[in-house]
Curated annotation (Swiss-Prot):
SUPFAM superfamilies: NAD(P)-binding Rossmann-fold domains. The keyword Oxidoreductase applies. InterPro entries: NAD(P)-bd_dom_sf, SDR_fam. GO terms for molecular function: oxidoreductase activity, acting on the CH-OH group of donors, NAD or NADP as acceptor. This is Oxidoreductase UcpA. Substrate binds at S141. The active site is at Y155 (proton acceptor). The keyword Oxidoreductase applies. NAD(+) binds at residues 10-32. It comes from Escherichia coli O157:H7. It holds the Pfam family adh_short_C2. Its EC number is 1.-.-.-.
Amino acid sequence: MGKLTGKTALITGALQGIGEGIARTFARHGANLILLDISPEIEKLADELCGRGHRCTAVVADVRDPASVAAAIKRAKEKEGRIDILVNNAGVCRLGSFLDMSDDDRDFHIDINIKGVWNVTKAVLPEMIARKDGRIVMMSSVTGDMVADPGETAYALTKAAIVGLTKSLAVEYAQSGIRVNAICPGYVRTPMAESIARQSNPEDPESVLTEMAKAIPLRRLADPLEVGELAAFLASDESSYLTGTQNVIDGGSTLPETVSVGI
């Protein structure tokens, strides 16, 4: 029996990257899955996992739209009954300097990375409170709260906000049996990382990923499945005394000094 057997998990942004990695990992640990994404392609991932013997429901929704979220969750609960675990993973990143970034691009980050998390959490939380049991995993980043890079001001702003939201919700709903924890990944080999690499160097994006890896003490980018294992831990009873925490998974990328004077 897996650590998540008998639990139903809603994962947003589940189609690809970290979200897909979490979905596959949760399935392996026995969870029933509700996979939410803005793309109808999410049905294919759900069909694949169902074909492998996992219980899985796909719902299409735009996390920016509370009505869309509410309708999707209603459909999912009609099939799955309840939601024990929420993984707020849906997120975006577009590079652009602070002065050059348009208001539309700024709001794009805020609407998905902050308001989207707010909307989904607000839709799921009341049921968890009524049962006095729930686990919420927030996808933040090392970018924003711990480190920063040029061109990622909007992204850093929103991911730092998720840390604050995590801690606030953890305090506010601890006595309701709700645990809320954040994951702060470093570089993960995902379509988002590949998109950042293309924006940085359209002619040779792979070289950007190679340089990223060289700057990491473990000398590689994370696999989404590794982030999935951390999420599974936070969603399981193994982390029963953890709430309001920031869990860094970055291969040591935030450890080195900018300029080393060591050996």
